[in-house]
Amino acid sequence: MNPIVVVHGGGAGPISKDRKERMHQGIVRAATVGYGILREGGSAVDAVEGAVVALEDDPEFNAGCGSVLNTDGEVEMDASIMDGKDLSVGAVSAVRCIANPIKLARLVMEKTPHCFLTDQGAAQFAAAMGVPEIPGEKLVTEKNKKRLEKEKHEKGAQKTDCEKNLGTVGAVALDFKGNVAYATSTGGIVNKMVGRVGDTPCVGAGGYADNDIGAISTTGHGESILKVNLARLTLFHIEQGKTVEEAADLSLGYMKSRVKGLGGLIVVSKTGDWVAKWTSTSMPWAAAKDGKLHFGIDPDDTAITDLP
């Protein structure tokens, strides 16, 4: 089986030219990291974790060190990861003071009998596992402080159909052994209520992975994604014989018509077919397969280049 990794940097509204370049660099870097892990014989789980860590470490994206702020001006992050081989899953929500929530989600998957830990319980588990704690203010950027003030003035968190509230990072992968996995991570919605949890850590909404079907990671307005169970809905269409592109169009179209939700997704099937689709204005994405790197941000700017 030829390995593949696909990554996304979150659905978004119009993006400035200079920020597009920075996001392009970040998304390509993440795909290259994930694909490098696969080429060296790493697992799909290793690849999606590595790709998402690269995005969490990039302040251009709404995850990890780039996470947006809640109403109290603090960072609360959500993440989940799933192994399609045996449907193992790990998720965390409302976590603070750690650099890479996706690493903690994987520890939940591999080191506990549970699927999901939240808030103080997740923090206690992180400490027990030796995950380094960092001061919360180190995750707060000046850019996101200004963004919060603007959103408070406009009551942005209440604008559920507004593209500026879209943002997540994610990855899906298929490895040499035919195993699939997904990972998704986010800082959530700007000016969200303290303790708000979106789709990202909820398996079936923020992502899903099953070797019998494929893997998916979603992005967009979390409440809308939760309402339609976007990830599992898309894989259901694939189970029913739809192509990955048809399945993506059907599920995104349903979310838009049924609950007026905008978003995007990346999918890889068990046979290695893949797609990146979105109904928001833009979505940074990249895919690496067969020594080629495919990437884009807007619907009409897809490019292909050779991988190093």
Curated annotation (Swiss-Prot):
Active site: 168 (nucleophile)
GO molecular function, one term: beta-aspartyl-peptidase activity
PTM remark: Cleaved into an alpha and beta chain by autocatalysis; this activates the enzyme. The N-terminal residue of the beta subunit is responsible for the nucleophile hydrolase activity.
GO terms, biological process: asparagine catabolic process via L-aspartate; proteolysis
InterPro entries (alphabetical): ASRGL1_meta, Ntn_hydrolases_N, Peptidase_T2
Known role: Has both L-asparaginase and beta-aspartyl peptidase activity. May be involved in the production of L-aspartate, which can act as an excitatory neurotransmitter in some brain regions. Is highly active with L-Asp beta-methyl ester. Besides, has catalytic activity toward beta-aspartyl dipeptides and their methyl esters, including beta-L-Asp-L-Phe, beta-L-Asp-L-Phe methyl ester (aspartame), beta-L-Asp-L-Ala, beta-L-Asp-L-Leu and beta-L-Asp-L-Lys. Does not have aspartylglucosaminidase activity and is inactive toward GlcNAc-L-Asn. Likewise, has no activity toward glutamine.
Protein name listed in UniProt: Isoaspartyl peptidase/L-asparaginase
Organism: Macaca fascicularis
